[in-house]
From Swiss-Prot:
Gene label: N
Species: Bunyavirus La Crosse
One GO cellular component term: viral nucleocapsid
Family: Belongs to the orthobunyavirus nucleocapsid protein family.
Residue sites binding RNA per the record: 17-18, 47, 50, 75-76, 81, 94, 124, 126, 129, 167, 177, 179-180, 183-185
MF GO annotations: RNA binding
Identification of the protein by name: Nucleoprotein
Assembly mode: Homotetramer. Binds the viral genomic RNA. Interacts with host PABP1.
Recorded domain comment: The N-terminus and C-terminus are involved in homooligomerization and play an essential role in viral RNA synthesis.
Keywords: Capsid protein, Eukaryotic host gene expression shutoff by virus, Eukaryotic host translation shutoff by virus, Helical capsid protein, Host gene expression shutoff by virus, Host-virus interaction, Ribonucleoprotein, RNA-binding, Viral nucleoprotein, Virion
Cited function: Encapsidates the genome protecting it from nucleases. The encapsidated genomic RNA is termed the nucleocapsid (NC) and serves as template for transcription and replication. The NC have a helical organization. Seems to participate in the nuclear relocalization of host PABP1, thereby inhibiting host cellular translation.
Subcellular location: Virion
Amino acid sequence: MSDLVFYDVASTGANGFDPDAGYMDFCVKNAESLNLAAVRIFFLNAAKAKAALSRKPERKANPKFGEWQVEVINNHFPGNRNNPIGNNDLTIHRLSGYLARWVLDQYNENDDESQHELIRTTIINPIAESNGVGWDSGPEIYLSFFPGTEMFLETFKFYPLTIGIHRVKQGMMDPQYLKKALRQRYGTLTADKWMSQKVAAIAKSLKDVEQLKWGKGGLSDTAKTFLQKFGIRLP
């Protein structure tokens, strides 16, 4: 009869997860240790971190990015993918979204152009750059190419969603990858609400994205200028 006895199990999803609350908790806990250098190292090595975690069976890990070390839930190892994730737990995906928002906050909260320039030259988005998009397209657009930014559709002006829509329309991405963005809130609005109430804002966001100088495997003007320093000139 034991095979007919059942028990409740912990949820495998982050039901009730509030990205804004999670982000604030993250900022409080990392206020003293987080800096642009560490964020730069994270974004340049996030893919490598995922690959390394996929080979480690431990449920938790403590990757170090420069001098900044952080505990993450390892949901990349095949046997760990259904493990529960708490509201304030960190994953590589959540870290990506949190750090992108942190960079945007640092950018918008400071009117000093020298600080803006420091951020632009320090933080590199490999995904945006590989599509020919640079900081000159605007901080919200540039940072929205980072995974995890879909958690903050209002902060990033729908760009995480509309970048995905454009890539699907151009055959650059499978439509299934839009699911995560289409489940998110926009501020206090649930997905079913903003899908009907924010059509104009989404259309404007998509228009901005479609007007970018897209180039598959292309280089941004910043990247071209960088290469010119080494005697490489591109059209």
